[in-house]
Each structure stands twice: as structure tokens, then as C-alpha cells.
Amino acid sequence: MRRELATSTMSLSYDDSVQALFRDGEEPVPSVRRLGELEDVVLDRDFFSRAAKDVILYYMFRDLHRREDEELFRGNGIRYDVTIIPPRNLGLEYVKTAGHYHPEASASMSYTEIYEVLNGKAHYLLQKAEGNRITDVLLVEAVKGDKVIIPPNYGHVTINPSDETLIMTNLVSGRFESVYVPYRNRSGAAYYELKDGSFRKNENYGRLPPLRQIMAEKRKWLPREMDLYTLFVTTPGLFKFLNDPSEYSQLST
């Protein structure tokens, strides 16, 4: 069954019977992430050994925009993506993304990113690395309409902790490639979120700070009633921090 998503400028709809996304009536082709590609980051090894490795865990639709907005996105070096994560368990864990960091942009600060939840519920598990140490771990809970900024120097994993399909969008600089190796080398994030609601420390990190849990922050300049795509095409200057993370500290609440 096809359902309309809450985007006012660009028409987006989703058919959960075939995991298809439609943009202005067209059906873009996604990149997919299969279970076998998450081998290094799944906690439950017994589950992984028995599960079909070609099962698709999530769908990534990169660089979506209306034709008339092509110059705006290219000129600003920004990309708009949609990610769809159907509900599933990975043995002991909820379904999750592989996890990645962003490379340094300038002044010892990595590129930032901003997400919006269009359907379902998301847990964004953020961790800050300083050398070989993790100095902060934060779980941000977000629901439909919430927008979450990934600050400079934080890696992140997205978790779908519900029985609904998680559909989220993001705006990000198009000037870099994400860095996945640190997560793979340590068998995932600093903490694993288990399907019983508990969290387990990842012993591959050694000493870890306590996990902090917060709800998505409300910011006046990111109104819930306006979707991320519309915000960008109407006020692209708001998103300079995506290419220049030094602007992040100037953002108001």
C-alpha cells in the first residue's frame, strides 16, 4: 500500500509491500545494505551464522531532488538522501545501520549531517572519538517530525527500535565519503542496543563513558511543520554548517 510522506515541496511516497519509494511519480533505484555486509558489527554471532546473508536490511536513495532544484543542490555542494529501514531483529539487537564517521573538513572538525524522521522512530547512537578513546556516547530518540544534527567529530549508527518502518531523510555535504572502518575494526559502536531495551558495552573499546539518553532537541529554526527538503530549498543559507563545521557553534536553539 502506497502512503504519502510529509514533504510539501517534493512529492514522496512509499509502498511498503515492495519497499519502493516514489519521487514526483518516479521510482528511483536504491543502494541496499545486506546482512552479510554488516558481519563485522553484529553482536549476536550465533544469529549471524544461521541467518541468510543476502537479506536486505535497509535501502538508501542517494541525491534525490527535483529537476528544477539541481543547480541549487549542486551549487551548494549539498545532497538530500532518503533511507528506509524496515523493522527487524538482528538476533539480540534491533536492526541498525553499519555505522560511520565523517572525515575532517577544517580546523580539526569533521563534517556534520542533519536527519529528519518522516515515519516511525529512530535512535541515533552517537560517539565522539579522541584518538583511540571514546569520550562521549549519546543516544538521541527521534520520532516523526524530529530533526537531529550530528555534531562535528561524532560517529553515528541509526537504530530502528520499533515495529514500524523507519523512513528518514538527511542533508549532508557532497564533498566527502563516509568512513566505516573504525566501526568494523571494533565490531560496531561503543554500545549495543538490545531488543529487550537494555544496552551492552562493546568490550572492544575498553573503558567507556556512561551512555547518555536524550530526546531530539527542538530548535526554532528547524520547525517541525516544515520538512527538511523544503527548509533547504527556501533557505539554503541555514545549512552552511554542513560544508563548514566551524559554523556549527553559531547555530541557535
In which residue ranges do the predicted regions lie?
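Active-site region of the double-stranded beta-helix
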Residues: 2-142, 160-253
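Histidine-centered metal-chelating micro-motifs
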Residues: 147-148, 152-157
